[in-house]
Amino acid sequence: MRKRDTSRWGVGKLYPSPAFWSRNEATDGLHTIQIGNQLLDILIRDRRSSTTVVTFQHRVSVRTPFPTLVGEKFTGEAGVNLIAVADPSVGLDPEVSLGWYLGNRAIGHLKPILHPILSEAIDAFHPKRLIFFGNSGGGYAAMNYAADFPNSIALTVNPRLDLSQGQDQDWATYMTKCHGAVGRTPYQRISSEYGVNLADAIPSSAQFYAAMYHNTGDSEFLEKNHAPFVKSRTGDLYIAERLDFDGNGHVPIPRDKLIETVRELATPSVPQSEAMKAAGFIRHI
């Protein structure tokens, strides 16, 4: 198990199962929901805003304690509510750097569990503007969940959106540590079940807005994930891109730029498409 440390968030509330969670419980602070022998952590910050941002974690190192809850500072500076979700699969083993919020052998697919939990938390805020945010590996979850919430915005930053290839070390570690996939046949079976390309999975009827930010200096992720998704889904999804150079390689978006982007997207009086344009995103039809 990965080392657990929640001291920075103070004393939280523990729920013995998802059945004990409801919108009435979605108050400011740390909430930990037991899912079997695993823990799902959610950090809520109620800033009395009409906009709520749901965040998903990025890749973490071996030394990073669990949970990783993203966005407390940048959403605070942007003045919006926060619902930050940690990936329980990352807590299973320190070698697991990413779980993409897919689930694991013990709990099965995570989305059927997490979706109603998120829905209750979101409903507690009654937001006029809803944004799902994820950087890198978190971008997969941001896009995956935003597609289920009409009129929401998926703000993805340098995302990995195609897990169907499954050929890198992060995926191999996730498969072995989280699913116990040993041997070629079990590995391929489980990998094909969980390793989904979102370009193929998101329904054409999804009524959300994809604000896709990418660093042009990160050519590998741009060419293998961002560009193919945009090319294949521009015809049936509302997609707008912002391509900036932030440095060579897989580097995060500069903090000030992220805060300003969220501020622009978070204005509910401005239609989503216009807010995206104001934030520098361009739609190619």
Annotate each PLM feature.
Residues 5-44:
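N-terminal cap/lid segment of alpha/beta-hydrolase-fold proteins
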Residues 30-94:
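Short, surface-exposed "cap/lid" segments of acyl-processing enzymes
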Residues 101-124:
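Alpha/beta-hydrolase active-site loop
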Residues 125-136:
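Alpha/beta-hydrolase fold nucleophile elbow
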Residues 134-144:
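Glycine-rich nucleophile elbow surrounding the catalytic serine of serine-hydrolase chemistry
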Residues 144-154:
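Conserved hydrolase catalytic core segment
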Residues 156-165:
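Active-site nucleophile loop of the alpha/beta-hydrolase fold
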Residues 170-277:
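The feature captures the conserved acid-bearing segment of alpha/beta-hydrolase catalytic domains
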